[in-house]
């Protein structure tokens, strides 16, 4: 799925990235917020928490509590997460490109 960065709020040791996508499969239009916190012991990495909301073309609302880890390489943030979503558990692997203002992500159901 392709997401665009809508906004970023920057803090001293954490930043929040707000993203949206026009089409994430059965979830339809999706909005997510990721709050990334730096790990002071490991440079260019940390943990993150977030929340997601999706609305399908049929009007079905999906909600998700998201959490994972991140690493940074240049302008790119690599994220991995295990997410508790309305219809079960998902695994996400993605790359946020700060220069291009977008994220590419793959989302898989955890059985």
What residue spans do the PLM features occupy?
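Beta-strand-enriched cores of mature, soluble protein domains
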Residues: 1-111
């Amino acid at each position: 799925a392709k997401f665009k960065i809508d906004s970023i709020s920057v803090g001293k040791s954490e930043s929040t990235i707000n993203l949206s996508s026009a089409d994430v499969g059965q979830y339809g239009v999706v909005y997510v917020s990721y709050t990334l916190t730096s790990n002071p012991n490991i440079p260019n990495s940390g943990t993150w928490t977030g929340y997601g909301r999706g609305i399908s073309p049929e009007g079905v609302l999906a909600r998700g509590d998201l959490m994972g880890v991140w690493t940074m390489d240049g302008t790119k943030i690599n994220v991995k997460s295990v997410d508790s979503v309305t219809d079960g558990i998902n695994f996400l692997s993605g790359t946020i490109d700060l220069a291009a203002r977008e994220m590419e992500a793959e989302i898989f159901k955890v059985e």
